[in-house]
Curated annotation (Swiss-Prot):
This is ATP synthase subunit beta. It is found in: Cellular thylakoid membrane. F-type ATPases have 2 components, CF(1) - the catalytic core - and CF(0) - the membrane proton channel. CF(1) has five subunits: alpha(3), beta(3), gamma(1), delta(1), epsilon(1). CF(0) has four main subunits: a(1), b(1), b'(1) and c(9-12). It comes from Synechococcus elongatus (strain ATCC 33912 / PCC 7942 / FACHB-805). The gene is atpD. Its main location: membrane.
Length: 484
C-alpha cells in the first residue's frame, strides 16, 4: 500500500537495468531518499503496469536512481513516474491479523481488501533513549528448556539456529500461541527471502493449529508478511521493515507485547548486498555491502522494549558454509541477547523441543537478573549434562557397570533431566494426542532442583518424558509403577 498523492511531481524513466530504474524529474522537484515512486501505464502489449520503486540515490543532473519492489518487465524509457512524496506505507492494527501481505502491504491471500484504519511508513527512527525500558526483564515462554537455560529478554533479540526438520516451525508456532494466551500479545511473521513453499506450508500449519482462525479471522494471533526468494532484491531488502512496522504499531499504539519472527535474517543482508552491487557501490569484505553494519543496525535498533510495550524478536540465522566468522552472521551476533540452538541429535532421540541445553546461550542468565536460585539450578543442570556427555564414550565401550557409583548416579539424573527438558506443545496436540503444557518459571526451577537433589531417584526415566511440571512426572511415575 503506497501513499498516493495528486500528480504534482511527475518524472520520466531514462534507464532501466534489471531492478534499477533511473528517473528524471523537473528542476527543483527531486524526490527525497526513500520516497516511493509509482510507475503506472501500459507496456508495448497494451497490458497495465503498476510498479513501485524506492529512491536510493540522487545522481545529479535532475536524476534519481530507484530500486523496484517488483519485476520491471515491460518498463520502457519515457514512461511517467509519480513521486508519492512519502516512503512506502503499510496497513497496521488488528485488521492485519490472520492475513498475508507483500512488502507494499498489499494482501496476497485472496481474502479481499484489508480494512485497516491507518497506515504507517516503513522507514522510522528507532525509539529515543528516554523512551526505552532499560531494566532487563525475563520474557517467560512457558517452555522449560528455554526459560531455565537460555531465557529470553523482553524486548530482546534471539537467534534461532537449526537445520531442516528439527522443529523450528513448531517452536515458532508454540511461542506465538503462548504469547497470545499468557501475555495477551500478538505476533508478526516476516518471511524474508525464503522459499515460497515454506511460506505456504507455514500458513497451512498456522490454520491447522488454530494460530490463524479461518472461521473468524479477527481471532487470529499472527500477521504474515512475505518477500520470497523469487522476488527482486528490493522487496527482500524491505520486507523485514514492513513486518517490523506492523509490530511497532501493536507495541506503541495498542501497548502490547509483540513477538516478531524474521526468517531469515541472513537473506535480509544478502538482498542488501545485491542492491548495493546494483547501485554501483564498492563491495567490502567477502563481497558484502560497505553499509552492512548500518543496514543491520537500522533494523535491529527498532526492535526493543519501550515504556509502553515490547517487541521481542526471534530471528532464524542461516550461517553460510557453517562459517560463524562470515561478516553477515558475525554482524547479526553483535545484536543478539540469546541463542536457541536446535539439535538434530536430540530430535532423533524424540526429545522435543530439540533445544540443545549446552549450546544455547543467553545474556540474561546472570544471578543479578534471574536470581541466585535460578542461576544455580541452570548451571547445575548444565554441568550434569556436560558430565554425562563426557562419560558417553566410556559407557559405549565399557558399559555402565564400569563407572563409579557417583558417575552412575550422575548419568541416571542426567538422563532424567534430558527427558524432563521435553514438553508437550499446544500446537502439536493434533499430532501427538497429548494436551499441551505451559510451565511457570518457578515450577520449572523447583522441578529440576528436585531431580538434582536426588528426591526423585526412585522414579523411572520414562516418567519424565513429555510432561509439564514435576508433579505430572511424579503422577506418571506412580502410574508406570502400578502398571508394572
Amino acid at each position: 500500500m503506497v501513499t498516493t498523492t495528486e500528480k504534482t511531481n511527475i518524472g520520466y524513466i531514462r534507464q532501466v537495468i534489471g531492478p534499477v530504474v533511473d528517473v528524471e524529474f523537473p528542476a527543483g522537484k527531486l524526490p527525497q531518499i526513500y520516497n516511493a515512486l509509482v510507475i503506472k501505464g501500459k507496456n508495448e502489449a497494451g497490458q497495465d503496469l503498476s510498479v513501485t520503486c524506492e529512491v536510493q540515490q540522487l545522481l545529479g543532473d535532475r536524476k534519481v536512481r530507484a530500486v523496484s519492489m517488483s519485476t520491471t518487465d515491460g518498463l520502457v524509457r519515457g514512461l511517467e513516474v509519480i513521486d508519492t512524496g512519502a516512503p512506502i506505507s503499510v496497513p497496521v492494527g488488528e485488521a492485519t491479523l490472520g492475513r498475508i501481505f507483500n512488502v507494499l502491504g498489499e494482501p496476497v491471500d485472496e481474502l479481499g481488501p484489508v480494512n485497516a484504519a491507518t497506515t504507517s511508513p516503513i522507514h522510522r527512527d528507532a525509539p529515543k533513549l528516554t523512551d526505552l525500558e532499560t531494566k532487563p526483564k525475563v520474557f517467560e515462554t512457558g517452555i522449560k528448556v528455554i526459560d531455565l537455560l537460555a531465557p529470553y529478554r523482553q524486548g530482546g533479540k534471539i537467534g534461532l539456529f537449526g537445520g531442516a526438520g528439527v522443529g523450528k516451525t513448531v517452536l515458532i508456532q508454540e511461542l506465538i500461541n503462548n504469547i497470545a494466551k499468557e501475555h495477551g500479545g500478538v505476533s508478526v511473521f516476516g518471511g524474508v527471502g525464503e522459499r515460497t513453499r515454506e511460506g505456504n506450508d507455514l500458513y497451512q500449519e498456522f490454520k491447522e493449529s488454530g494460530v490463524i482462525d479461518e472461521k473468524n479471522i479477527a481471532n487470529s494471533k499472527v500477521a504474515l508478511v512475505y518477500g520470497q526468494m523469487n522476488e527482486p532484491p528490493g522487496a527482500r531488502m524491505r520486507v523485514g521493515l514492513s513486518a517490523l512496522t506492523m509490530a511497532e504499531h501493536f507495541r506503541d499504539v495498542n501497548k502490547q507485547d509483540v513477538l516478531l519472527f524474521i526468517d531469515n535474517i541472513f537473506r535480509f543482508v544478502q538482498a542488501g548486498s545485491e542492491v548495493s552491487a546494483l547501485l554501483g557501490r564498492m563491495p567490502s569484505a567477502v563481497g558484502y555491502q560497505p553499509t552492512l553494519g548500518t543496514d543491520v543496525g537500522q533494523l535491529q535498533e527498532r526492535i526493543t522494549s519501550t515504556l509502553e510495550g515490547s517487541i521481542t524478536s526471534i530471528q532464524a540465522v542461516y550461517v553460510p558454509a557453517d562459517d560463524l566468522t562470515d561478516p553477515a552472521p558475525a554482524t547479526t551476533f553483535a545484536h543478539l541477547d540469546a541463542t536457541t540452538v536446535l539439535s538434530r541429535g536430540l530430535a532423533s532421540k524424540g526429545i522435543y523441543p530439540a533445544v540443545d541445553p549446552l549450546d544455547s546461550t543467553s545474556t540474561m542468565l546472570q544471578p543479578s537478573i534471574v536470581g541466585e536460585e535460578h542461576y544455580r539450578t541452570a548451571r547445575a543442570v548444565q554441568s550434569t549434562l556436560q558430565r554425562y556427555k563426557e562419560l558417553q564414550d566410556i559407557i559405549a565401550i565399557l558399559g555402565l557397570d564400569e563407572l563409579s557409583e557417583e558417575d552412575r548416579q550422575t548419568v541416571a539424573r542426567a538422563r532424567k533431566i534430558e527427558k524432563f527438558l521435553s514438553q508437550p506443545f499446544f500446537v502439536a496436540e493434533v499430532f501427538t494426542g497429548s494436551p499441551g503444557k505451559y510451565v511457570k518459571l518457578e515450577d520449572t526451577i523447583s522441578g529440576f532442583n528436585r531431580i538434582l537433589n536426588g528426591e526423585l531417584d526412585d522414579l523411572p526415566e520414562q516418567a519424565f518424558y513429555l510432561v509439564g511440571d514435576i508433579q505430572e512426572a511424579i503422577e506418571k511415575g506412580a502410574k508406570l509403577k502400578a502398571e508394572s
